[in-house]
């Protein structure tokens, strides 16, 4: 597939521009591509849906997913200033789909695979419980200026809800997307894949772990250890050097 997105390691429009990325799927983590579900060559879906995630709008056009056609070309115009009149939902949902898949493929290399309780519809015979791809809800209308990730035990679909904050669309803030996906990882790994409720107490490390994932996947070659790295600068509108959610 081809996806016009803010690609890894670009954290948000504050730090880079969109690029049309060709075939970014990893052959080890997603052996039949991002739009497969049956484990055979050829895509089952030509929308932003596949084995690892289904990205769709959950605002005023609930359930809508953009269409990439037979060539799986998801190349849509964007207005980075969100408004009800111009939501740029095709571009936003495409970015959300890309990042959910990229995160899946990266962490797969580090051991968050089927047997460890990762998020896939079809586990391709590699253990664990399937039927639990991520439902990634773009421009979700149930909240603002935030995001969340609900993670049941292995075999249950996680739900990622990405919100709008005024004129800023959280679906373009890749650091926030990664942070939320990180909650899914830590919820599945702490206590075991079937016991996803072990991080509900106040004294737990889930928020810090999720921030780490966001920092790791958006690090640039010139970054240095002492550098301040704020989280969520696009969503909150604080600017690239603003304090934002955390620094």
PLM feature segments, named:
Residues 1-247:
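Extracellular zinc-dependent metalloprotease catalytic-domain scaffold
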């Amino acid at each position: 597939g081809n996806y016009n997105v803010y690609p890894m390691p670009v954290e948000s429009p504050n730090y880079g521009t969109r690029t049309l990325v060709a075939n970014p799927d990893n052959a080890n983590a997603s052996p039949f591509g991002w739009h497969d579900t049956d484990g055979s060559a050829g895509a089952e879906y030509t929308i932003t849906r596949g084995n690892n995630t289904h990205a769709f709008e959950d605002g005023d056009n609930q359930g809508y997913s953009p269409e990439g056609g037979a060539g799986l070309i998801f190349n849509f115009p964007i207005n980075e200033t969100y408004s009800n009149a111009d939501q740029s939902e095709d571009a936003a949902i495409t970015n959300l789909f890309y990042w959910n898949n990229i995160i899946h493929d990266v962490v797969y290399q580090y051991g968050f695979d089927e047997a460890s309780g990762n998020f896939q519809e079809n586990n391709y015979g590699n253990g664990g419980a399937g039927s639990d791809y991520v439902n990634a809800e773009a421009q979700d209308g149930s909240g603002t200026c935030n995001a969340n990730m609900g993670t049941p035990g292995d075999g249950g679909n996680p739900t990622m809800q990405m919100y709008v904050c005024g004129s800023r669309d959280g679906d373009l803030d890749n650091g926030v997307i990664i942070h939320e996906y990180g909650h899914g990882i830590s919820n599945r790994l702490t206590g075991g894949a079937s016991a996803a409720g072990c991080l509900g107490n106040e004294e737990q490390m889930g928020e810090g772990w999720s921030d780490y994932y966001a920092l790791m996947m958006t690090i640039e070659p010139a970054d240095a250890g002492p550098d301040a790295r704020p989280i969520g600068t696009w969503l909150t509108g604080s600017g690239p050097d603003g304090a934002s959610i955390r620094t």
